[in-house]
Curated annotation (Swiss-Prot):
Lineage, highest ranks first: Eukaryota, Metazoa, Chordata, Craniata, Vertebrata
Biological process annotations from GO: mRNA processing; protein folding; RNA splicing
Name listed for the protein in its UniProt record: Peptidyl-prolyl cis-trans isomerase-like 3
InterPro entries in the cross-refs: Cyclophilin-like_dom_sf (IPR029000), Cyclophilin-type_PPIase (IPR024936), Cyclophilin-type_PPIase_CS (IPR020892), Cyclophilin-type_PPIase_dom (IPR002130), Cyclophilin_A-like (IPR044666)
Quaternary structure note: Identified in the spliceosome C complex.
Family named by the database record: Belongs to the cyclophilin-type PPIase family. PPIL3 subfamily.
Molecular functions (GO terms): peptidyl-prolyl cis-trans isomerase activity
Superkingdom of source: Eukaryota
Length: 161
C-alpha cells in the first residue's frame, strides 16, 4: 500500500503500514482520496529533524480527522523513528491525532512511542533533500517560499469501497 505526494519540488512515494496502524491509515488514505491535502503547505521545516504538513489552514494549528475529532495513537514496538524518511502523525499530546503529519530527516528516537509512525518514504529521498535545503524563517521554521502538496496518487487503498 502506497501513495505519492506530488509537491512543488518533486514527488515523494510513501509506503503506509495499514496492518500495524489501521485507524491512522484509514484516516490518512481517506483524507488523500478526498483531496483534503491538495494545496497544503509544508508549514514547519527543521533541518536535520523533520518537515511537517497536512493543515489546510497553513498555520500549523488546523486540520481534522475524517471523524471530525482527534483520534488515538497507534504505537508499535516495530515502528520507530530510526531512519530518514519515517512518516508520523503530528499531535499536541497523547491521542490528539488529526490530519497533520511529518517526515523525518534522520533518526529521531526521542519521538518513539509519542508519535504514531504509519509510513516510510520508499522513493523520492531526493525530494526530501530539496525540502530540507529550503530557507526558513529562523523563529517559526516556516519556509520563506511556500511549497505545497499539489495532489496525491493512491496506488492501492485497502479501505476503498
Amino acid at each position: 500500500m502506497s501513495v505519492t505526494l506530488h509537491t512543488d519540488v518533486g514527488d515523494i512515494k510513501i509506503e503506509v503500514f495499514c496492518e500495524r496502524t489501521p485507524k491512522t491509515c484509514e484516516n490518512f488514505l481517506a483524507l488523500c482520496a478526498s483531496n483534503y491535502y491538495n494545496g497544503c503547505v509544508f508549514h514547519r521545516n527543521i533541518k536535520g529533524f523533520m518537515v511537517q504538513t497536512g493543515d489546510p489552514t497553513g498555520t500549523g494549528r488546523g486540520g481534522s480527522s475524517i471523524w471530525a475529532k482527534k483520534f488515538e495513537d497507534e504505537y508499535s514496538e516495530y515502528l520507530k523513528h530510526n531512519v530518514r524518511g519515517v512518516v508520523s502523525m503530528a499531535n499536541n499530546g497523547p491521542n490528539t491525532n488529526g490530519s497533520q503529519f511529518f517526515i523525518t530527516y534522520g533518526k529521531q528516537p526521542h519521538l518513539d512511542m509519542k508519535y504514531t509512525v504509519f509510513g516510510k518514504v520508499i522513493d523520492g529521498l531526493e525530494t526530501l533533500d530539496e525540502l530540507e535545503k529550503l530557507p526558513v524563517n529562523e523563529k517559526t521554521y516556516r519556509p520563506l517560499n511556500d511549497v505545497h502538496i499539489k495532489d496525491i496518487t493512491i496506488h492501492a487503498n485497502p479501505f476503498a469501497q
